[in-house]
Amino acid sequence: MSEEEAAQIPRSSVWEQDQQNVVQRVVALPLVRATCTAVCDVYSAAKDRHPLLGSACRLAENCVCGLTTRALDHAQPLLEHLQPQLATMNSLACRGLDKLEEKLPFLQQPSETVVTSAKDVVASSVTGVVDLARRGRRWSVELKRSVSHAVDVVLEKSEELVDHFLPMTEEELAALAAEAEGPEVGSVEDQRRQQGYFVRLGSLSARIRHLAYEHSVGKLRQSKHRAQDTLAQLQETLELIDHMQCGVTPTAPACPGKVHELWGEWGQRPPESRRRSQAELETLVLSRSLTQELQGTVEALESSVRGLPAGAQEKVAEVRRSVDALQTAFADARCFRDVPAAALAEGRGRVAHAHACVDELLELVVQAVPLPWLVGPFAPILVERPEPLPDLADLVDEVIGGPDPRWAHLDWPAQQRAWEAEHRDGSGNGDGDRMGVAGDICEQEPETPSCPVKHTLMPELDF
């Protein structure tokens, strides 16, 4: 044997040992070995179960073995020539296998263990996702419950505030009493809980609108009574001045009021201290005080009718002009001689006219159809009334009270007709001088400064 052949035998054996070591390491891996065993078992079982398939597989095995043997025989010279390169590749493959075994520990485990571990990981992941979904569902349920409770609290508090600031009317109390008489009717709180949020909110808005409308009309009627009370006292004061100007000894008014108090003070004074100038001055001071009080009432009426029809605003403007004319007539007077007779007659007519205008003002407001405050999905039961309630004025009178009976003796319609006839004909029963002075006062009557009107739905709701 030559030296070259002797040298090649050891190198060939070393390469085969290294190659065998690499192959053995790969095959010896538990995962690979278990997988190959499982595949072989399935393959053998398939061949035994199907004879035709088994014959074909055995034939294919023989062919593959023959082809592999021949290929190795022909490739042997090439493999011997590439032995150094193959050895290097084998070494690199071994290093890569070592690193792979470190990074993938499951390669050292059988396939059953790997499959079981994978199942456990998947099951734990699915369980985590399911738990997260359950927590999210539980959180959404709690959030819904919290929102529902918050809405209930807000609605209940709103209903309590409405009941406190806008008490129930007689109609609502009668309806509740009729419902309470039924054998199977629950309480008001139970009925409210059974209703939906939108229905409760719509009912609340309709109730607020109805109660606030009645409340606002009641306040307007109260202002009307206050204004008419002041006008009645002012009318008696003007009559007192007229009687004293004509030289007629006036009698004490039978009705209580500021004029009655003034006469009571005069009656309690001793005769020597009753000076006519002092009485005249106090009467004029009383007239100016009543006029200023009337101006404040008119300002309240003006703020209440902003945004209402032009007819209501015009009535208040007429009252304002009458009050301003009275204020101008009595502004500089220190005694009865400073008040012209024509101005006094004109003032009495203006007071009567203002009284009638205040009466007509409330009638216009009561007859006006109120606009709905809330429309859309949050007001499912709001329906605009085609006409106002027929007994609304009577219901308001029950709360506010009717006209003051102290001034029932004043014939306001007759005084109003006399004032209108005097202005229509241009001449009255008095002398021409009185009418001339009255005409001058009318011409010099200051105009009410115009101010921008703020239009609102229900401006009288300033409570």
From Swiss-Prot:
GO biological process assignments: lipid droplet organization; lipid storage; mitochondrion localization; negative regulation of fatty acid beta-oxidation; negative regulation of lipase activity; negative regulation of peroxisome proliferator activated receptor signaling pathway; negative regulation of reactive oxygen species metabolic process; negative regulation of triglyceride catabolic process
A GO CC term attached to the entry: cytoplasm
Residue ranges, annotated region (Interaction with LIPE): 1-108
Predominant place of localization: other
Cysteines joined through disulfide linkages: none
Keywords, sorted A to Z: Cytoplasm, Lipid droplet, Mitochondrion, Phosphoprotein
Region of interest (Essential for lipid droplet targeting), residue spans: 1-173
InterPro entries (alphabetical): Perilipin
Description of post-translational modifications: Phosphorylated by PKA. Phosphorylated on serine in skeletal muscle at rest or upon lipolytic stimulation.
One Pfam short name: Perilipin
Compartments where found: Lipid droplet; Cytoplasm; Mitochondrion
Residue(s) carrying Phosphoserine: 2, 148, 322
Tissue specificity field: Expressed in skeletal muscle, liver, heart and kidney.
One GO MF term: lipase binding
Sequence segments annotated as region (Recruits mitochondria at the lipid droplet surface): 444-463
Function: Lipid droplet-associated protein that maintains the balance between lipogenesis and lipolysis and also regulates fatty acid oxidation in oxidative tissues. Recruits mitochondria to the surface of lipid droplets and is involved in lipid droplet homeostasis by regulating both the storage of fatty acids in the form of triglycerides and the release of fatty acids for mitochondrial fatty acid oxidation. In lipid droplet triacylglycerol hydrolysis, plays a role as a scaffolding protein for three major key lipolytic players: ABHD5, PNPLA2 and LIPE.
Subunit structure: Homooligomer. Interacts with PNPLA2; prevents interaction of PNPLA2 with ABHD5. Interacts with ABHD5; targets ABHD5 to lipid droplets and promotes interaction of ABHD5 with PNPLA2. Interacts with LIPE.
Protein's name according to its UniProt entry: Perilipin-5
Species, as recorded: Homo sapiens
Gene giving rise to this polypeptide: PLIN5
